[in-house]
Amino acid sequence: MKHLRIIAIDIGNSATNLGLFTGDRLERYDFLPSSPEYSEKVCQLIESWQPDFHHIVIGSVVPALGDLLETRIKERHNTTPMMVEDFKTELIPLRVDRPETVGVDRIVNCYAALRLFGAPAIVISLGTANTFEAIDAEGEYIGGAIAPGIKISLET
């Protein structure tokens, strides 16, 4: 049985992480600064990894950079990336007053926690911002909090 080959791109506030997966196995990984100047380098990395992938999936907390990379990939690789923003509410039920305000990074982290460990869960992500998420016993996102990351906290 042939496994799907997927390139996953995670655009954060500070870094863009790329991974090439065959099925559940991570085959290649790289990261670059999150900046428009690096969109060409992302396309070059995709080309160097191997052209026979099935999908590219982009999750971005920097909408302008996600849109730019989507456009560049369409032009360079003749494929339309899947944007997590377009289907984020299908990954996990969001039982909060304003689900549109929950970032794709937070939703994807919770989805991964559910797949790997099950519910209930507390999901913590430390980065430019630190996020804390709660998933109830039914596997539903019930809320979270955002705090400044370590570097930002040390600077203030």
Q: Residue spans of the language-model regions?
A:
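Gly/Thr-rich phosphate-binding beta-strand-loop-beta motif of the actin/hexokinase/Hsp70
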Residues: 1-27, 113, 119-141
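Glycine-rich phosphate-binding loop plus the immediately following alpha-helix
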Residues: 115-118, 142-156
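Short, well-ordered secondary-structure micro-motifs
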Residues: 19, 69, 94-95, 133-135, ...
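A general structural signal for well-ordered alpha-helical segments in protein cores
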Residues: 66, 106-110, 154
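Conserved phosphate-binding catalytic cores of ATP/NTP-utilizing and phosphoryl-transfer enzymes
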Residues: 1-3, 91-121
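N-terminal glycine/serine-rich phosphate-binding loop of ATP-dependent small-molecule kinases
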Residues: 1-7, 11-89
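General beta-strand structural signal in soluble alpha/beta enzymes
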Residues: 81-85, 102-104, 122-125
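Short gly/pro/ser/thr-enriched loop/turn and capping motifs at secondary-structure boundaries
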Residues: 87-91, 151-154
